[in-house]
């Protein structure tokens, strides 16, 4: 049974401090006493520098840190303290996010090319997902896998506050990722996506409305139950990429805020991790089996890392 596209229902928790900050200009919020109060002043270390608009970090089984360069069009790898270019699907490529498949391939969402894959051992590139019902995507952004290997990705570009036609898609693993289902269809630039440890729901960040949605899975038909707004954010242009730790805490990069929000399993913001410089925090990755959270920043093109309280979830590709 093919599920209907979910209509989003706006409910859920909205923190009091979000209401207070609603009247504060966004450029002032990142310096606000409230965000300073949320900071634990964790030491943040510089790992590497280079590239053009860094995004989509991931670790492979050998411990290599990969990422994408949105403006450069490259899938790249951190070597020492440098960002080294490895593969490009096309001169027109604009990769946005990346995730590791269990077979070793790296899946890349691309604003112009859909979803393509790279096999590090053979260096093979495959343009895997180009169209939905014969039509090109608006511009895929971020992605994640569930524990069955199904791929979820957001389709974000050309959408915004005045055109809430962004979407969340699922590509079925059993079909070789050829069977696509649109799960959500009315989002204002959907961005990050993640599945918590219990596997019963999926989070989707909606950048242009500065909030996250949580959508419970309806496992009877492979779709979703009605979604609800789980978190509103306090600064920046909106939520970008996310990662989740083994206890269900969400780490949310927020674009133009110079930092990362930490959200507890009850959807409350409990901490703001500020990076030393660069405002364009784009995405995150946990070093496998550790509490080290790696952060890409795209204004000054730095990779940072910070030690948090819990070990990160093990991605499906590393299980």
What residue ranges belong to the model's regions?
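Blade/loop signatures of beta-propeller domains
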Residues: 30-42
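Beta-rich, blade/repeat-based domains predominating
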Residues: 48-64, 90-114, 133-151, 158-159, ...
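A short loop-to-beta-strand structural motif that recurs across blades of beta-propeller domains
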Residues: 74-76, 114-116, 167-169, 211-213, ...
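Short, solvent-exposed loop/turn segments at conserved positions within beta-propeller repeat blades
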Residues: 71, 159-166, 207-209, 255-256
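A short beta-strand motif characteristic of beta-propeller blades
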Residues: 43-48, 83-88, 126-133, 178-184, ...
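Bacterial N-terminal signal peptides
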Residues: 12-25
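Blade-level signature of beta-propeller repeat domains, shared across WD40, Kelch, NHL, RCC1
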Residues: 285-319
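Short loop/turn segments that connect beta-strands within beta-propeller blades
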Residues: 78-82, 119-123, 172-176, 218-220, ...
